[in-house]
Amino acid sequence: VIYTAVTSPGEAGFVDDDGNNVGNITGTSDMVLADQQLKLIREMMPDAKKVGIFYSTNEANSKAEIAAYEKAADQYGFEIVTQGITSSADMPMAADSLIKKVDCITNLTDNLVVSNMQTYLEKANKAKIPVFGSEVEQVKLGCVACVGIDFVDLGEQTGEMAAKVLKGEAEAKDMK
């Protein structure tokens, strides 16, 4: 089995606590590099104190990403302020609420949140609150910057892994 764009392979049961593949399985992760993203935000916004994050309360991957941000926040002098949503209908009010509390917003690879990005991007732009993307395409859509995922590159990497397995050059369980 080869997976692609799984945010937290450990949470999904694909790798053990030491990061080793469980069984004959491997793949790629789209976990945001929280430490590097916060470093970028600090460089671009030296006076910022509070970083906002929207997340779906129904996505386990979002909780893993938030934990990574919270772990790295102190190093850069940030407080992470989260705002959960359960459906697209929640986003307008959630955006109004979070934007009032933060200096900027950073995205996760949360499907529900990203599918509603235009809603909060418009509100954030009006309030002059920068939004940092979680992947390259989001910058093209209006986010100010990102140290994030390029899903095309991630797909190519996963495809190369699959090709090696199919050609008998490697076993999934031995790949990282």
Q: Which residues does each predicted region cover?
A:
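Extracytoplasmic/secreted envelope proteins and their assembly/folding machinery
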Residues: D35-L38, I66, E70, P92-A95, ...
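Glycine-rich, charge-decorated loop segments at or immediately adjacent to ligand/cofactor-binding or catalytic sites
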Residues: A12-G19, M91-M93, V139-G148
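Short beta-strand-centered segments that line the small-molecule binding cleft or hinge
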Residues: V1-D18, L121, K126
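Hinge/beta->alpha junction and helix N-cap segments in small-molecule ligand-binding domains
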Residues: T28-D35, Y55-E65, T82-M91, D110-N111, ...
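Hydrophobic alpha-helical segments within soluble ligand-binding/sensing domains
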Residues: S8-A48, I149-A170
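Short beta-strand elements of ligand-binding domains
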Residues: V1-G10, G27-S29, P130-V136
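An alpha-beta-alpha
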Residues: T26-D74, E171-K176
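Hydrophobic alpha-helical
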Residues: T86-L141
